[in-house]
């Protein structure tokens, strides 16, 4: 059984995914890295996910996300960090759910907003003319949806790093293989 960590940008999916994988002694997979590799192979151009989204557009980016998630069907006993937007597509959620325990890393809206709006340049999903409102709208929509699709939600707002890793490991111990 895999452990899938997902949540809104800036919640720590990659950071905690690496730490949990190390503690469990298993592989760590970051779907963003795989998207970048596939794009580089297909287009002979090395770009970050943000750059791919901007250059190729949201449809191409979501198609790459879908391709990556479908390619993980035979992966077992791994920790997988999945970009927040990927979880908005039903087919991605269902593909991951087959062999994975989905954990939503919840972080307080104001904490995340501060992190995300401090990025330069702003993420592509933020309207530069009204960054706070666009973040609040995105957060509200995704949080509602994520709570419906997750197996478990972990509120990491006031938790220390070690405790977060410990809690994720505990959550996955009781899951049937």
Q: Language-model segments: which ranges?
A:
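ATP-dependent small-molecule kinase phosphotransfer cores
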Residues: 33-85, 94
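P-loop (Walker A) phosphate-binding loop of NTP-binding proteins
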Residues: 8-11
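NTP-dependent small-molecule kinase module
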Residues: 19, 23, 140-177
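Post-Walker A helix-loop "phosphate-sensing" segment adjacent to the P-loop in P-loop NTPases
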Residues: 22-31
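Hydrophobic anchor at the beta1->P-loop junction of P-loop NTPases
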Residues: 5
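Walker A/P-loop
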Residues: 14
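A glycine- and Lys/Arg-enriched "phosphate-lid" helix/loop adjacent to the NTP-binding pocket
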Residues: 99-143
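Short glycine-rich anion-binding loops that position phosphate/pyrophosphate groups of nucleotides
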Residues: 84-86, 108-110, 159
């Amino acid at each position: 059984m895999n452990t899938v960590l997902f949540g809104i940008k800036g919640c720590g999916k990659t950071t905690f995914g690496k730490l949990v994988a190390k503690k469990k002694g298993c592989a760590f997979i970051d779907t963003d890295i795989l998207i970048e590799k596939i794009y580089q192979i297909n287009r002979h151009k090395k770009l970050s996910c943000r750059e791919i989204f901007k250059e190729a557009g949201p449809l191409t980016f979501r198609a790459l996300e879908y391709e990556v998630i479908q390619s993980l069907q035979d992966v077992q006993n791994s920790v997988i960090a999945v970009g927040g937007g990927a979880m908005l597509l039903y087919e991605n959620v269902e593909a991951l759910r087959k062999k994975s325990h989905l954990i939503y890393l919840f972080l307080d809206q104001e904490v995340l907003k501060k992190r995300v709006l401090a990025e330069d340049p702003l993420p592509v999903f933020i309207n530069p003319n009204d960054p706070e409102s666009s973040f609040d709208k995105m957060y509200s929509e995704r949080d509602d949806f994520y709570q419906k699709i997750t197996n478990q939600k972990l509120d990491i707002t006031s938790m220390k790093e070690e405790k977060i890793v410990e809690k994720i490991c505990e959550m996955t111990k009781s899951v049937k293989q």
